[in-house]
Structure formats: C-alpha cells, structure tokens
From Swiss-Prot:
Alphabetical list of PANTHER family matching this protein: UROCANATE HYDRATASE
InterPro entries named in the record: Urocanase, Urocanase-like, Urocanase_C, Urocanase_central_sf, Urocanase_CS, Urocanase_N, Urocanase_Rossmann-like, Urocanase_sf
Gene: hutU
Cellular component GO terms, alphabetical: cytoplasm
Any GO BP: L-histidine catabolic process to glutamate and formate
Protein name in UniProt: Urocanate hydratase
UniProt function note: Catalyzes the conversion of urocanate to 4-imidazolone-5-propionate.
Coiled coil: none
Amino acid sequence: MREAFHKYRDIEIRAPRGTALNARSWLCEAPLRLLMNNLDPEVAENPKELVVYGGIGRAARNWECFDRIVECLKNLEEDETLLIQSGKPVGVFRTQRDAPRVLIANSNLVPHWATWEHFHELDARGLAMFGQMTAGSWIYIGSQGIVQGTFETFVEAGRQHYGGDLRGRWLLSAGLGGMGGAQPLAATLAGASALLVECQQSRIDFRLKTGYLDEQARDLDDALARIARYRGEGRAVSVGLCANAADILPELVRRGVRPDLVTDQTSAHDPLNGYLPRGWSWAEYRERAAREPAATVAAAKRSMAGHVRAMLAFHERGVPVFDYGNNIRQMARDEGVENAFDFPGFVPAYIRPLFCRGIGPFRWVALSGEAEDIYRTDARVKELIPDDPHLHRWLGMARERIRFQGLPARICWVGLGQRARLGLAFNEMVRRGELKAPVVIGRDHLDSGSVASPNRETEAMRDGSDAVSDWPLLNALLNTASGATWVSLHHGGGVGMGYSQHAGVAIVCDGTDEAAARIARVLHNDPASGVMRHADAGYPEAIACARERGLKLPMLGDA
C-alpha cells in the first residue's frame, strides 16, 4: 500500500549558513544547503507547496520525500551516492569518493508516454514530479540565475536591430515568474524601458520588492503614458501591468502601438497550471484546473493562440519578435496557427554563437551566507579575465543592482577554459581562507551541450539534429565520470512534457587537492561537450574552438 504524501506544509525553510556542518562532509552539506535554499521564501515562488519556479517545478516530490532527502544527506558517507527519482530518495549506494554524492533523474518518461496528460496522472498518484531545470536539481538562485542570459539576449537584439543602442527603445513582454521576473531588470540594464504584463499581483509585488521591477501602472493607458514619457526622456524604466497578456497584446495591435522588441515569458509550457485563459480570474483558473483539466487546457491554449497571433502581427509590421523558450509557438500551432514559427526563438536568433564556444551560464553560491564571499570572487573573476569589458560591466551592474535571494550567489556567462580557471581559483581561495566557507559552482540546464529542445536551445540546428537527445545524456554521463558533486537529468523543462531533455551539474570547491582535480575535469569537460555538440553539427565557430582547445573529436577530421 502506498503511503500518504503531502505537497503542502505551513513552514519556512532556509539554508544553514556558516562553517558548522550538518552533514558529514562539505560534499554532502552543499546539496543539503542548496536544496533548502531552493525553498527559501526569498527564492521560491510557492515554497510551502515545494514549488520553486516554472508553474509546478518542485524541489522534492512531497514533504515526506523532502524530510527523507534531508535525513539521507545528513548521514551520507563520503563514498556513498544518493539516488533521487523524480524528487524521491530511492537508494543510497556505496560508490567512491570521487563519484557524485547525488544523482538525480526528474520527470523522465518513455517518449510515447511523454505527455502532460500522462504526467499529471502520475503526479496525482504520487509517482512523479516536474523538476523544471534548476528546481529539481537544487541549484536555483532566484531571478539572478536568468538575468545575465536575458541581458545578453536583449543586448544582442539591440546590436542586431538598433545599432547597439537601446536608449529610447522599449520592450513588450509578459510573465514575471521565476524566469520572466528577470526581464524588467535585464531590459533596463541593457538600456531599454520595458512594459511587463503579469496576471498575478503577488508576482508584481515580489518583483517590486526585490528591485527587479521599477514601478506598476494602474491600467494600460497609464502604462503606455509612462513608457512614452521614459522613452522621450531617454530613461530606462520597467513598468508592470496587472492584466492578461492574451487581452493586452491584441489590444495593442488594434491600437497600432509599436514596441521596439516583443517577446514572452509566461508559463505557456504548462497550460494547466501556468497560463491564465482570457476572461478568467486566477482563482477560477485554479478551481477549474482541478475540476475540469481538459477544458482548462483547451481554454488556455485558445488564449495562447490569440496571444501568438498578436505577436505575429507585430512581426509582420517589422517589429523584432522572438520566442523566449516557453513553447508558446507550439501551443498556438496546436490550435491552428500554422505560421506560429514565423518569428524565431531566442537561441538561433541571438545566443547560438556563444554556445559554439562553450559560453553559457556559470553560477556559484557562497555556502557561508556571506555576501563578501561573492564580492571577493567577483574581484577574482575580473583579475583572471582582464580583457573582457562586457563581463566587467556585467559584474559591476550585478553588484549594484541585483539583490541576493537566499544564499548569496553570482552568475556570469563564461566559456571553455575560463570556467575551469575560475573554479580552480575559487577552490584556492577557500584553501587559503580568503572565503569564509566553500562555494558551489553550477549552471542552468540551458547551456551549450546539456540540452535537446527543438523549440528552444536546439531549434534550427545547422545539420537538422534539433531533436537528437543523445547529447544531454552524454553530458550527464561525462560529468558523472568526471567527478561532479551532483548531476541531474531532466525532461520537459522550459517547454513542457515531450519537448526537451536536459542535464545539470554542480561541483563543490572545498579547498582540497581532491576537489581541485575534480574541478579541473568537470569544468573543462562540461563546456567542452557543448563545443563538441556544435562542432558535430557543423558550426565553423565550434570547429575552430575545438581545434584551438585541442579537443579530441574523432570524426572532425579536416572538416
């Protein structure tokens, strides 16, 4: 008989700080603290229900599983590995000291059954959990985790479309959840104003509180007046509007309003839990989702179709429009919008050249809980990468503008060679006592070689290999063999069930020689696998990078 399980608990979780261990080593303490940090009220979207971000992206399957995971991590030996199956601890096995302390598999389904309908059946029976990307892999750091990637996207869009200057320009988008909440700050850092539509007032309040959003408008007329004023003044200010994007975008099209950039980060990947149908209140949406899920999904997807038609109308008028990876184009196509993919996704439009060089989201977390540890590592990054003014500008803006959520953390986009250099330097700082406690290095699953997602990261690959998911599997296996502290393999993150597979990695810098050896392997091999993947697809930039870095790619030959 299956035991009872609970997804709600009226409790606040915060990660321990300082140097006192709750587990038997820092390699076990780190995943313990990062799991708990994912559920910090400053970090998670709905922590009392274990939801970190992305609709129903959870850190653990239920509270009973959370309790047992914590117990396992506290008692895990230095040569044991904990196995997590969709948020549930299922085994502890003797491995070796250089093996991962935790191996995680979340939301993975045999392809024929990889649908939201089947997943929700399993979820209701307590047999599955949606891990999103960094929710179930315990390395979410709040909206900062996506800010720089969003910033890089907006900057590149400005370079391509507006000569590199977004002053006096404005972005139209929607969604202020765990991912979309980065948009207003990223836009203003890039020099543009932004109008962000969000249907939940609580999310607007949270972004205002954390400084990611500057202000809120009373209604659409007020929002447009504010944007017009800030554009005229050459100021970059973000404005939130509590409304439904499925209503607002068609109305803007009707009025002939012309934004300078248009995208979307609503939770369109999950129509049952993340996208409000037109004319519904949020309370009605949640009630009807529980009572009549099929009708709710249908209503949400109809609204998405109207949303995408409005985006297409902007595109047809010459406005740069791009999909930001929530699969809204696919949902619209399912509803009969045959030209939904006329505007591109953000990766082929703006990011892929970075992936070809193994450049992606590199993040680290100070287990001490001390902000000063992050500031010291910021300075070390600048010393080790002295000739990248764009990176230095980012680090300066991040320190000035980004408020830490939970444990202090930092993200910056760096590539092959740079990641290992930084990781080894951080480990040496721990060894010398320059940092109060060890740091954890991780990344988003959205990275160069760790994801297969034909409507997002691997859209429009040069060789047509968009849907080949061997690559994230190889990435996870390679990071496991290389000695990462924990490794995760997920399905459905970002774009929903059936549309992606992706892998995550984290490694602890505890100041030991053993850690240095693991760091050198993992932080070289992880981005190198991304260069390999893109070189195999025929990208000249990746082939050149592979040769420059001396990667052994047997089939590369003289291509």
